[in-house]
UniProtKB/Swiss-Prot annotation:
Family: Belongs to the WD repeat SEC31 family.
Positions of WD repeats: 5-47, 66-109, 118-158, 164-204, 208-251, 255-295, 298-338, 383-411
Gene3D superfamilies in UniProt: 1.25.40.1030, Functional domain of the splicing factor Prp18 (1.20.940.10), YVTN repeat-like/Quinoprotein amine dehydrogenase (2.130.10.10)
Compartments, record wording: Cytoplasmic vesicle, COPII-coated vesicle membrane; Endoplasmic reticulum membrane
Protein's membrane topology: Peripheral membrane protein
Composition-biased stretches (Pro residues): 991-1004, 1047-1063, 1076-1098
Protein name as annotated: Protein transport protein SEC31
A GO term from the CC aspect: COPII vesicle coat
Function: Component of the coat protein complex II (COPII) which promotes the formation of transport vesicles from the endoplasmic reticulum (ER). The coat has two main functions, the physical deformation of the endoplasmic reticulum membrane into vesicles and the selection of cargo molecules.
Biased composition (Polar residues): 859-886, 912-921, 1018-1036
Species of origin: Ajellomyces capsulatus
Gene Ontology molecular function, alphabetical: structural molecule activity
Subunit structure: The COPII coat is composed of at least 5 proteins: the SEC23/24 complex, the SEC13/31 complex, and the protein SAR1. SEC13 and SEC31 make a 2:2 tetramer that forms the edge element of the COPII outer coat. The tetramer self-assembles in multiple copies to form the complete polyhedral cage. Interacts (via WD 8) with SEC13.
Swiss-Prot/TrEMBL keywords: Cytoplasmic vesicle, Endoplasmic reticulum, ER-Golgi transport, Membrane, Protein transport, Repeat, Transport, WD repeat
Gene that encodes it: SEC31
Length: 1273
């Protein structure tokens, strides 16, 4: 609830019609006096300028016009003649004036449309018909009620008899559903319903004994319901009427402390009603249930007018006699934390002075609407959730929209079910490692040639010899066979059938090699030709019939040089001579004899000589010279397949990828330059063969876009552009994934911060992860996101989303039960320092180590445990005099089997069925309420609290009888379990009052009751305890007794408890309740024992030892066996008629499941008539307290309100409270309304004391409300 703008005027107001930027028209209020006592009366228009952020809160008028008289009321309606509409003013001089808003804003000299003077006195009220904007109703003095038509403004007609009534008509309102029905309210208390069509009176209501009517308003949706208000200080009421039963109001709304002056019922939400009045307050109600939602900031003078904005109900305006018109919103714009922080900065020094806080702290919004306004509510809504979920909200029963009960559904959503199945199948195949099957499936289902080729190439890479498979894929093995066949047709073979032995020549020379037939026929003329070389084989004494001469004399010089070089073994020189003489055949023969160096020299010379020769020689040169780069860089791209085949055949494994990549780069450049898609596809082949993922991905992404556009153009009715895109993306991701698996690709750039080669692929991975997550496949999405670099910004966000969505909520580990410990332990107990308490011992005391002591219980997390070492019984921030507070070591627990003690202070006996006692205290958190009383500091105490309370205070010394105390520092004197604190006169010096500071923490629950010595229990104590008074006392097993709790000093907000405290799930079991507080009893000091105490009588460790019958309600029991009666402390026996208390069972055994409530919490529509005053009065007073309470006490006030709501729920369900209690609570509410706090307090005490079984957590809220109401001005 934020104040948006302020208009510094005391004026009547009207909102502009239409949905344009809102304006407000103001007219100087008749009878109001400004601070400067000016007599000027003006009509002004104000532009709120809400679109300007941080604009000035106080506005300046956009138009201004002086008038002859002051205004009682203003109305603004739409008009065909004016875009901004017509403004009507009800003037004190009896004139009805109409102005053109457009002319006013433009500054025209004649904005007045008309002026009528039919009224004989002041015009008190007017309103345009909501259905027929040309009809205007005006009411004034002497019962004058006129209906005017703007089209004929000079001839209105009057409703009612002239002499019937002479009272003034103060207010009127047109019915929102039936346009010819009008209601008026008069100063004489008549509420009259008129039928304008028949010009007759239809119905008259008696307004609560004819009390004056200040405002009337029709229900926006129900034509028979209306609301009236009373302006009297004695009866500041709002009456809700249903005309179907007009004898009495249907509901009375009480909340204003003084007369109600104005009402405004929200047209967009009938559950919202504004009222303002003489108590300077503007209150928001639910008129359907009577619930007061809260009030807006209180001003310093009467709020005489409030109006909702007719088109934007988030805003409303309120006019008051302090000279301000406030434009506010019902939307909160500041969090509670900010508001609390702001309040803490202005908190007064004195926390006890409530009035100082109330005056110094700014009044802020004190409520929030429990449900969203109707214009923000939706009967159904839906939202997509991350992870393929759709959250939808719809009415449980659409046939009953008024029920407003909704159901939330979370369902799975898939944009494309085919995609989900495809992804699942693909992921399963990947896990199985069956890549070949994936490739075969994708080849069969390929939608275009490019995809088919890509998958075939990837399939070839899976084989054992990928190079040979690439050659086969290119078709070169069949071409070799075709060439051999064409050579055989030329007759170059020896025979058609075979060689000399009938075996095909190709078989004898190897597969695929055939003998040249023509050469064979040339050398077949000599029979010995085949055996020539055999005959020349080296053998000793070999002699043939073919002698020769090394020199014949006819040789050329070159022949002689070659011969001489051969004789000397100088093959290189012989080769040089052969090359010089261009004897290439001889050169090669010599080179063969000379070794590899000569061969290389001969080959080089040959290729140099054959530069202009056939192309195969260039190819041979590259192969022989191992310079395949010449083919890659210089071979024509039209023969890229031949180049790839050559590379596959002759390239080494090390240079193969680079050679293919270079050839692919040339093809890609050609594709970009010429726009040739075939070259791009060939480039993709080369990149795939070279396993260059970063190169082929760019081509695949381009193809993806092209294929997607083509598929969209050819799409059928059942396909959407998104599903087509997702399938194309799925195909891309599958190809990349399989390719990475086949090539064992490792991304070396995952640790780089930027400039990644695979940026395009990373973007697709992110997109695919989003699609997979949207289909509920979070694991798949996470796997692909893990492939991205760690520093990728989009990947970081996507990973976090996946992580949050897949993160399993770890169940909180339950507190471990304390297992039963062994009876024997040799570990001495730890003895920490005792926190300083209220009782000051004179000397430190210790306790002997107990060999039978059970181990200390495990430290279990306790949200109510105190922080630090503060005592649960001493207020925070208070430390008594240092000389009275020596540090005392904490003794061990009580002995289990009668072992001697050094201390004369023993703990109280523990029953056999009780758990080990634990002490909890109020936590330091400020958002948790106290357990039983008003917080200190809420109101100023009538008497200051003292560290040592008065002995005359009749308080209960210990509200938790069967518990072990939290072991504070104690006096050497033994203190009776029911002994009050020592009186002031016994102290050696006065204890100073505590310093000012925050309110002390209080215990949220009493400690658990005791357990038999040596037997720690694993069972939880019952939570159904309702009474803190002891019911029975059993014989203690030792001389120990309880330490009393420190009672509070007298305070109007923290009075001493005069009756049993409220029902509390941490309180002991209920029993017979005393009718009055117990008086303090004198303590009997027991001297320290001279020896080991006598052992307790044999008894079951799990049974009670009941006391003997008592002679009176306060008679002490007989002395216990084995104890000294002279020093036995006095205990209270059970009251007459009470039976011994059975052991409290576990929470599971005693606590019955609460029956289901008949109606949901917060429902107030079923509160019976006899309980309705309780609800109305307590709610109204609670809202009054909330409005004036300082912000620093927001938590305590909210807790009281929460507890009151528990009471209202019980009343609505008609459970827990009996009829007599309901009647008593009604009397309490009436006393509270009359400010009779003493009577309210006594009724509260009576219910608390005598009907405690009907008191739940709600009773504390009633008690707090009484105290707060008394402290609130």
């Amino acid at each position: 609830m934020v104040r948006l703008r302020e208009i510094p005027r005391t004026a009547a107001l009207a909102w502009s019609p239409g949905s344009a930027s809102p304006y407000i028209a103001t007219g100087t209020r008749a009878g109001a006096v400004d601070a400067d006592f000016s007599n000027e009366t003006d009509l002004e228009l104000w532009d709120l300028a809400l679109e300007q952020e941080g604009g000035s809160a106080e506005l300046q008028p956009a138009a201004k016009l002086s008038t002859e008289s002051g205004f009682h009321d203003l109305a603004w309606t739409e008009s065909e003649d004016s875009s901004r509409g017509i403004i009507a003013g009800a003037l004190e001089n009896g004139s009805l004036d109409l102005w053109n808003a457009d002319k006013l804003l433009s500054g025209a000299s004649d904005p007045l449309v008309s002026r009528a003077s039919q009224h004989s006195g002041p015009v008190k009220t007017l309103q345009f018909n909501p259905r027929h904007s040309n009809l205007l109703a005006t009411g004034g003095s002497k019962g004058e009620l006129f209906i005017s038509d703007l089209n004929n403004i000079d001839h209105p007609f009057r409703l009612g008899n002239v002499n019937a009534r002479l009272d003034d008509i103060e207010c009127l309102d047109w019915n929102k559903k039936v346009p010819h029905i009008l209601v008026t309210g008069s100063s004489a208390g008549f509420v009259t319903v008129w039928d304008v069509k028949t010009k007759k009176e239809s119905l008259t209501l008696n307004n609560l004994g004819r009390k004056a009517v200040s405002a009337v308003a029709w229900d926006p949706e129900k034509p028979t319901k209306l609301i009236t208000s009373i302006p009297l200080e004695t009866d500041p009421l709002i009456l809700v009427w249903d005309l179907r039963n007009s004898n009495a109001p249907e509901r009375v709304l009480r909340g204003h402390e003084s007369g109600v002056l104005s009402l405004s019922w929200c047209a967009q939400d009938p559950d919202l009603l504004l009222s303002s009045g003489k108590d300077n307050r503007t209150i928001c109600w639910n008129p359907q249930t009577g619930v007061q939602y809260g009030e807006f900031p209180v001003v310093t003078n009467w709020t005489f007018l409030t109006r909702w904005n007719p088109h934007n109900p988030n805003m409303f305006a309120t006019a008051s006699f302090d000279g301000r018109i406030s434009i506010q919103t019902i939307q909160n714009t500041k969090s509670d934390a900010i508001a609390q922080a702001g309040a803490s900065q202005v908190q007064p020094v004195d926390d006890e002075d409530f009035f100082a806080k109330a005056q110094s702290q700014p009044q802020a919004s004190t409520f929030s609407l429990p449900t969203a306004p109707k214009w923000l509510q939706r009967p159904s809504s839906v939202s997509f959730g991350f992870g393929g979920r759709v959250i939808s909200v719809g009415l449980t029963d659409p046939s009953k929209p008024a029920s407003r009960t909704s159901k939330v559904r979370i369902t799975r959503f898939e944009v494309d079910s085919i995609l989900s199945s495809t992804t699942q199948t693909f992921e399963e195949a990947l896990k199985a490692g069956d890549l070949r099957r994936i490739c075969e499936t994708r080849i069969e289902n390929a939608q275009n040639d490019s995809d088919r080729v890509d998958w075939k190439i990837i399939e070839t890479l899976i084989s054992d010899n990928p190079k040979m498979q690439l050659i086969n894929y290119l078709g070169f093995s069949s071409e070799v066979d075709e060439t051999a066949d064409s050579l055989s047709k030329l007759g170059l073979g020896k025979s058609e059938d075979g060689g000399a032995n009938g075996v095909p020549e190709s078989d004898s020379r190897g597969p695929g090699v055939k003998k040249h037939k023509r050469l064979s026929s040339i050398f077949d003329t000599h029979a010995d030709s085949d055996n020539f070389l055999t005959d020349l084989s080296a053998s000793k004494g070999a002699k043939t019939n073919n002698p020769f001469q090394i020199y014949t004399g006819s040789e050329s010089e070159a022949d002689r040089g070659i011969t001489r070089a051969l004789l000397l073994g100088d093959f290189e020189k012989a080769l040089d001579i052969c090359l010089q003489e261009d004897r290439m055949s001889d050169a090669f023969m010599v080179a063969i004899c000379g070794g590899q160096k000569c061969i290389d020299k001969a080959q080089e010379a040959y290729f140099q000589k054959q530069l202009e020769g056939p192309n195969y020689l260039r190819l041979m040169a590259a192969i022989v010279g191992k310079n395949l780069w010449d083919i890659v860089h210089n071979a024509g791209l039209a023969n890229w397949k031949e180049a790839i085949a050559t590379i596959c055949t002759f390239a080494t494994d090390a240079e193969f990828p680079d050679l293919c990549e270079t050839l692919g780069d040339r093809l890609e450049e050609q594709a970009k330059a010429e726009g040739d898609k075939e070259s791009r596809k060939n480039a993709a082949f080369c990149f795939l063969a070279s396993s260059k993922l970063e190169k082929v991905v760019g081509i695949w992404i381009d193809e993806l876009q092209e294929n997607e556009n083509k598929a969209i153009q050819e799409a059928t009715n059942g396909e959407t552009s998104f599903s087509i895109h997702v399938r194309a993306l799925q195909n891309l991701i599958e190809k990349v994934t399989v390719f990475r698996h086949v090539t064992k690709f490792e991304d070396a750039e995952t640790q780089k911060p930027s400039d990644w080669k695979l940026t395009l692929l990373y973007d697709k991975y992110i997109e695919y992860a989003d699609v997979a997550a949207a289909h509920g496949q979070l694991g798949v999405a996470e796997r692909y996101l893990d492939l991205l670099p760690q520093a990728h910004p989009a990947a970081v966000v996507a990973r976090n989303r996946i992580k949050l969505a897949t993160e399993k909520t770890t169940a909180r580990s339950a507190p471990a039960h304390i297992s039963a410990a062994s009876h024997l332990t040799t570990k001495p107990p730890q003895q920490p320092n005792v926190p300083r308490g209220m009782y000051n011992p004179s000397a430190p005391m210790t306790q002997a180590n107990n060999l039978f002591k059970p181990p200390a219980p495990m430290q279990v997390s306790n949200p109510y445990a105190p922080t630090g070492a503060s005592s649960a019984y001493s207020p925070a921030g208070y430390q008594p005099s240092q000389q009275h507070q020596p540090t005392v070591p904490l003794g061990g627990p009580p002995q289990a089997f009668g072992t001697a003690q050094q201390s004369n202070i023993a703990p109280p006996p523990r029953a056999a069925n009780q758990s080990p006692s634990t002490v909890t205290s109020y936590t330091q958190a400020t958002n948790l309420p106290a357990w039983n009383d008003l917080p200190e500091g809420f109101a100023k105490a009538l008497t200051p609290r003292r560290g040592t309370p008065s002995a005359a205070a009749a308080t209960i010394s210990s509200p938790f009888p069967h518990q072990q105390p939290p072991q504070p520092s104690q006096s050497p004197q033994t203190i009776s379990p029911h002994q009050p604190p020592p009186p002031r006169q016994r102290t050696s010096m006065a204890v100073p009052p505590p310093p000012r500071g925050p309110a002390p923490p209080r215990m949220t629950s009493p400690p658990a009751v005791g357990q038999p010595h040596g037997f720690p229990s694993t069972r939880k104590t019952s939570l159904n305890f309702k009474c803190i008074y002891p019911t029975t006392q059993h014989t203690p097993t030792g001389p120990g007794m309880n330490v009393p709790q420190i009672p509070r000093g007298p305070s109007p907000y923290n009075a001493p408890p005069t009756g049993p405290p409220p029902s509390n799930r941490y309180a002991p079991s209920p029993a017979a309740q005393p009718s009055a507080p117990q008086p303090p009893r004198a303590a009997v000091a027991a001297p320290p024992p001279t020896g080991p105490p006598a052992p307790a009588p044999a008894q079951s460790p799990y049974s009670y030892q009941h006391p003997p019958p008592a002679h009176g309600s306060y008679a002490p029991p007989s002395a216990p066996t084995g104890a000294r009666p002279d020093h036995q402390p006095q205990h209270q026996p059970p009251p007459p008629g009470s039976s011994p208390v059975s052991r409290p069972g576990t929470a599971q055994s005693q606590r019955k499941p609460a029956p289901a409530a008949k109606y949901p919490p917060g429902d107030r529509s079923h509160i019976p008539a006899n309980a309705q005053p309780i609800f109305e009065i307590l709610s109204a007073d609670m809202q009054r307290v909330k409005a004036r309470a300082p912000t620093s006490f927001k938590a305590q006030v909210n807790d009281a309100e929460r507890r009151l709501n528990i009471l209202f729920d019980h009343l609505n369900n008609e459970d827990l409270l009996k009829p007599a209690t309901v009647e008593s609570m009604a009397e309490l509410a009436r006393a509270l309304q009359a400010r009779d706090y003493e009577t309210a307090q006594s009724i509260h005490l009576d219910i608390f004391t005598n009907r405690n079984d009907e008191c739940g957590n709600w009773m504390v809220g009633v008690k707090r409300l009484i105290g707060m109401s008394r402290a609130t001005p």
